[in-house]
Amino acid sequence: MQNQRIRIRLKGFDHRLIDQSTAEIVETAKRTGAQVRGPIPLPTRKERYTILTSPHVNKDARDQYELRTHKRLVDIVEPTEKTVDALMRLDLAAGVDVQISLG
């Protein structure tokens, strides 16, 4: 796998789970002899929702909710076959969305 690059994007609502999963990926890649760039924190997406608490009157009574989506990026430069096998066997947390692309 010469001149290859694996780009891993992690997404989730809990930043602690993402950091833990990122640390596992980086540790696994370094242990198998690959060169790692990252983790790079990407901008957090904040979605805000405002909801009226009363069904009919009292427009001033509102609740506000926020949903934060945290993202991290890890680049693995020049991965070995052992690196790819170890990453495929890696079991990450359930609350983390992982996207892997080869470049």
From Swiss-Prot:
Q: Does the keyword Ribonucleoprotein apply?
A: yes
- What is the documented function of this protein? Involved in the binding of tRNA to the ribosomes.
Q: Subunit arrangement?
A: Part of the 30S ribosomal subunit.
Q: Which GO terms describe its cellular component?
A: ribonucleoprotein complex; ribosome
Gene3D superfamilies attached to this UniProt entry: Ribosomal protein S10 domain
Question: Which PANTHER family would you find in this protein's record?
Answer: 30S RIBOSOMAL PROTEIN S10 FAMILY MEMBER (PTHR11700)
Please, which domain of life does this record's source organism belong to?
Answer: Bacteria
PROSITE patterns membership: RIBOSOMAL_S10
- State one molecular function term (GO): tRNA binding
Entry's family note: Belongs to the universal ribosomal protein uS10 family.
Keyword Ribonucleoprotein listed? The answer is: yes
InterPro entries (alphabetical): Ribosomal_uS10, Ribosomal_uS10_CS, Ribosomal_uS10_dom, Ribosomal_uS10_dom_sf
Give the record's keywords alphabetically: Ribonucleoprotein, Ribosomal protein
The protein's name: Small ribosomal subunit protein uS10
GO biological process annotations for this chain's record? translation
